[in-house]
């Protein structure tokens, strides 16, 4: 349930792209020339928005655009009912359903939404109805039943999730004590290393690589190392390969791995080997949660960085929204989502009462109270170390 915040944001959001209007207009006008005018009205308004937008731009009212979008949707509906067979029907239908979704979602727009435009990296121009606070929409779903129970091992801080998953202020929250003993895990925190953008250089990568190597050589076994991005993972991996010289076996997660490659990657943790296995992975990715490697299959996780989401227009919009309303903009947009990825990655190590292992947090920011206050109770005992 810890993923429900982001998933519900997307579920209750909608977006349109200016370029799609032009592409579909070229198709439809060949079969029904009269509909071209409605496309032109929409495109003209979107063009005005595009000219106003530099990085991204927030709007309070898009009533004029919605008027023409609804007229266009009505004419497209009639066109698709009459024209059941033409080569591009699938493309036109997908555009129509996306347009209908945008119109339907607009009816939900209130103070829990931000309407914004932005220029995409692929040079397309987007307008989005962004559900920054999904609590009201989720509460409507919850109210259809007698009760709802949300469960996750990483609901921290709990108030963050209570605020975003429901509008009610009297919901119960239960912190279940862990079934695992303190002796099963060792928590280490590196105080002389960081994944900050300003610190991402060769010397920092070498220090991180040294941590990884010393951890892997301290006890033979299988380890996962989690990074905040593919780019940094690759940079440290290359440094590690030069530093290690073949003392351990290292594998690395590839972007867009299919099911076959994913299974082959996980199978490495069940294979018998004479050396330590170090698996380089991306935090928040397919190996960062939802995998179950028990006992000797995994005896340690090294987590590089605080998991902060990449800076983007949407993250900046979230930060501005929650800063104005709660004075916690950075926490809600970056710190809390990032810490959840850290907790999920750390949770790969101890899966049963028979597991033992090490969790290593490599970022000096974990020593700050803003982060220590987000630690689970089981992390009260920890050792601070340097390379």
Language-model regions, residue ranges each:
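ASCE RecA-like P-loop NTPase motor cores
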Residues: 1-387
């Amino acid at each position: 349930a810890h993923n429900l915040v982001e998933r519900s944001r997307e579920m209750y959001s909608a977006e349109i792209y200016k370029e799609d209007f032009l592409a579909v207009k070229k198709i439809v006008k060949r079969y029904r020339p009269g509909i071209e005018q409605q496309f032109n009205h929409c495109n003209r308004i979107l063009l005005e928005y595009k000219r106003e937008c530099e990085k991204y731009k927030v709007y309070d009212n898009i009533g004029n655009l919605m008027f023409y979008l609804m007229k266009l949707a009505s004419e497209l509906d009639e066109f698709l009912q009459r024209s059941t067979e033409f080569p591009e029907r699938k493309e036109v239908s997908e555009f129509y359903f996306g347009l209908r979704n945008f119109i339907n979602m607009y009816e939900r727009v209130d103070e829990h939404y931000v309407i914004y435009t932005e220029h995409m990296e692929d040079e397309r121009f987007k307008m989005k109805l962004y559900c920054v606070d999904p609590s009201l929409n989720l509460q409507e779903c919850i109210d259809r039943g007698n009760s709802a129970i949300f469960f996750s091992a990483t609901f921290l801080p709990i108030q963050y999730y209570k605020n975003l998953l429901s509008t009610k202020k009297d919901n119960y929250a239960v912190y279940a004590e862990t079934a695992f003993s303190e002796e099963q895990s060792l928590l280490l925190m590196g105080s002389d290393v960081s994944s900050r953008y300003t610190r991402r250089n060769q010397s920092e990568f070498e220090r991180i690589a040294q941590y990884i190597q010393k951890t892997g050589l301290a006890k033979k076994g299988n380890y996962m190392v989690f990074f905040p991005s593919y780019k940094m993972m690759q940079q440290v991996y290359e440094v590690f390969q030069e530093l290690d010289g073949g003392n351990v076996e290292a594998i690395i997660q590839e972007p867009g791995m299919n099911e076959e490659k994913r299974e082959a990657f996980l199978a490495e943790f069940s294979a018998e080997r004479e050396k330590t296995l170090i698996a380089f992975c991306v935090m928040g990715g397919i190996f960062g949660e939802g995998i179950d490697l028990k006992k000797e299959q995994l005896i340690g996780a090294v987590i590089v960085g605080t998991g902060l989401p990449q800076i983007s227009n949407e993250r900046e919009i979230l930060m501005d929204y929650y800063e104005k309303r709660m004075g916690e903009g950075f926490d809600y947009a970056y710190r809390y989502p990032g810490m959840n990825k850290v907790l999920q990655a750390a949770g790969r190590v101890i899966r049963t009462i028979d597991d033992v292992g090490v969790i290593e947090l490599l970022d000096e920011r974990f020593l700050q109270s803003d982060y220590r206050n987000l630690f689970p109770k089981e992390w009260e005992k920890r050792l601070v170390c340097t390379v």
